[in-house]
Amino acid sequence: MPPPHPPVPRRILPTIAAAQLGGTSLWFAANAIDADLQRDWALTSSTAGAVTSAVHAGFIVGTLFYSLLMIADRFSPRKVYLVSSLLAALANAAVLLLPEVLLSMTATRFGIGFFLAGIYPVGMKIASGWYQKGLGGALGFLVGALVLGTALPHALRALGTAWPWEEVILVLSTLAVGGGLLMWFLVPDGPYLVKGGASARER
């Protein structure tokens, strides 16, 4: 007879969702301030496509890197999530210190995309460690958090129309750091977390 499913603390799913929302808010951070960059950096309207493509390219490369090296299997997924969140937030804020040229923006966006591979997919892995039963519903909830997270920069820009674009960047980086800290301090490894070919309950 298989052991009963342990109860999942009520905070787990909302905390993972909040952490995912904070981390994925960096995805379209630059798009939300595109008009500001055109004005202050003398960039053209075509830069939004290049910036978005840089994020996607970074995510693809990052996903391959994390997968091929099995980063989330070799190390604690929570630690991977925290470090990835911190590095993505740093890449986002780095644009404030770099020369005001398109290369600076695309390079930092590529970095964000790369480290998002340690946020969104790894967050899903952390959730799967808690929800052997009802995993589909939990993952659906997290997909909703992803959608809200990617829309957050635009909502933030709409609410803070008088804010300098630099403040928008800093707020989004702060949210990403907060998401990483939430995951690290409030979400322990789940009983079904698969690591090294076996779940925690099998070891």
Predicted segments — roles?
Residues 21, 91, 102-118:
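Hydrophobic core of transmembrane alpha-helices in multi-pass small-molecule transporters
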Residues 28, 55-64, 150-151:
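Residue-level signature of mid-helix packing/kink "hotspots" within the transmembrane helices
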Residues 133, 141-192:
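Helix-loop-helix hairpin linking two adjacent transmembrane segments in secondary transporters
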Residues 11-45, 63-66:
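Extracytoplasmic
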Residues 2-6, 189-203:
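Juxtamembrane intracellular "pre-TM" segments in multi-pass secondary transporters
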Residues 108-145:
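Cytoplasmic helix-loop-helix junction between adjacent transmembrane helices
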Residues 43-52, 101, 139:
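Juxtamembrane helix-start elements in MFS-like secondary transporters
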Residues 63-102:
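Conserved MFS/SLC helix-loop-helix module at the cytosolic interface between two early adjacent transmembrane helices
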